[in-house]
């Protein structure tokens, strides 16, 4: 389990996180929802120790963040971080050299799942297919938790559906997943728990049944309902 306990973070004079507390379990998909700029990505980077927190505590499987935490969690950003001139096969080689947890068999299975070829050059792929490569690079690591920043942002509907299908496949296995998004339409059925953020605080946590009730609503609509009580 990933646990955040009263986490705070300030950038300059702006308080980005104001006592954020929630949990994300293995085998479950937790979604951080909210409009842009409410602290979702900051939370992800804090879990990865890429952004130091000011106060509070973050635990992974009951332990405070340490060097070993990197072996338990992977972060998939919303833009591919590999050199765009690389072929997919070269990106796989890079990952294998850099990460002991790289699983080449799973990488090939994911490549087949998305109908991509190792010889494809990343710079020549569509935005949707680039997002799939980014996803493969994260999912092919043998870790307990996968953090995904806006995996559905700005891609075509077909790519959205393919990526959504991964979450219900054996390729996720029993790993915990945390997703950030500013739009929950079309993915309500994937989520086990949703955490609604605004202005650095958690407005509400939604269970599976409550998430289903948000179908067809925008994040802004959901926020308005919460504020109205």
Residue ranges and their predicted role:
Residues 79-133:
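ABC-family P-loop ATPase nucleotide-binding domains
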Residues 181-182:
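H-loop/switch region of ABC-family ATPase nucleotide-binding domains
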């Amino acid at each position: 389990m990933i646990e955040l306990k009263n986490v705070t973070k300030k950038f300059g004079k702006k308080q980005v996180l104001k006592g954020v507390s929630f949990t994300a379990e293995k085998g479950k998909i937790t979604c951080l929802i909210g409009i842009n700029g409410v602290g979702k990505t900051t939370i992800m980077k804090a879990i990865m120790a890429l952004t130091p927190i000011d106060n509070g505590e973050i635990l992974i499987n009951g332990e405070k963040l340490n060097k070993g935490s990197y072996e338990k969690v992977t972060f998939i950003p919303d833009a591919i971080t590999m050199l765009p001139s690389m072929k997919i096969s070269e990106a796989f080689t890079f990952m294998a050299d850099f990460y002991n947890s790289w699983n080449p068999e799973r990488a090939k299975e994911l490549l087949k799942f998305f109908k991509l070829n190792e010889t494809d050059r990343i710079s020549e792929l569509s935005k949707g297919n680039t997002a799939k490569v980014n996803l493969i690079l994260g999912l092919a690591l043998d870790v307990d938790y996968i953090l995904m920043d806006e995996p559905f942002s700005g891609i075509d509907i077909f790519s959205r559906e393919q990526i959504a299908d991964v979450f219900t496949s054996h390729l996720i296995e029993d790993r915990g997943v945390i997703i950030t998004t500013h739009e929950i339409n079309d993915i309500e059925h994937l989520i086990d728990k949703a955490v609604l953020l605004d202005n650095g605080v958690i407005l509400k946590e939604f269970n599976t049944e409550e998430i289903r009730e948000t179908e067809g609503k925008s994040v802004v609509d959901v926020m308005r309902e919460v504020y109205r009580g």
